[in-house]
Regions:
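Serine-dependent acyl-ester chemistry module
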Residues: 1-137, 142, 152-163
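Conserved PLP-binding active-site segment of the aspartate aminotransferase-like
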Residues: 161-172
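Short, amphipathic alpha-helical "lid/cap" segments that border enzyme active or binding sites
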Residues: 11, 15, 171-182, 186
């Protein structure tokens, strides 16, 4: 079974499990609060899926990497943008372009490509924008509450270091999240 097929099955299974969990909670008159998983977008993807990179562009990719080493982000930007467009399901191409866009202060473009890099990471070793999207879609379908922790952390990412390692946010952000969730629960329960 191919890596892509395995990931597709994993995502479908996750969607089914979340759907069943929310239905179970609602059937028992319980509140369900879905919380998106934080994703450290500064961590490179572990692997791109087979067949996602056109090898005829290898020279251009090597050129971009050399330009990054020389800190020539402006020249690297146009080449990396082309690579990300042509190899549009390649995690590494999106990651490199996202990092270059971030260096040039193009924050929205950087966020878009770094999220795509995480989504196209074939290793499935951490949370992914795909899981968060499934969670939000399923919560919306059942009219369940949804708290976007990932978006909250990304909003704070420009202000400093948010993550203490590849996966976990700093405790400060977890405390803020806990307080926000507690307030939401109080409103839901009308306390």
């Amino acid at each position: 079974i191919s890596t892509q097929k395995r990931n597709e099955i994993t995502f479908k299974l996750f969607e089914s499990e979340v759907d069943e969990l929310i239905t179970y909670a609602k059937d028992r008159n319980s509140y369900f609060l879905a919380i998106s998983a934080p994703i450290n977008l500064d961590v490179p993807p572990k692997s791109s899926c087979p067949g996602s990179f056109d090898e005829s562009f290898r020279t251009k990719l090597d050129n971009v990497i050399e330009l990054i080493k020389k800190k020539d982000y402006k020249l690297a930007y146009s080449i990396s943008k082309e690579l990300a467009l042509i190899n549009n399901s390649n995690a590494r191409s999106h990651f490199i372009h996202g990092k270059i866009a971030k260096k040039l202060g193009k924050d929205q473009e950087a966020l878009k490509h770094l999220e795509l890099a995480a989504a196209f990471d074939c290793d499935n070793w951490r949370s992914s924008p795909v899981y968060n999207s499934i969670l939000k879609k399923t919560a919306d379908k059942h009219d369940a509450a949804f708290f976007d922790l990932h978006a909250l952390l990304q909003d704070n990412a420009s202000k400093g270091v948010v993550f203490m390692d590849d996966i976990y946010p700093q405790n400060l952000y977890l405390e803020k999240t806990a307080n926000t969730i507690a307030d939401r629960i109080k409103k839901l329960l009308k306390l």
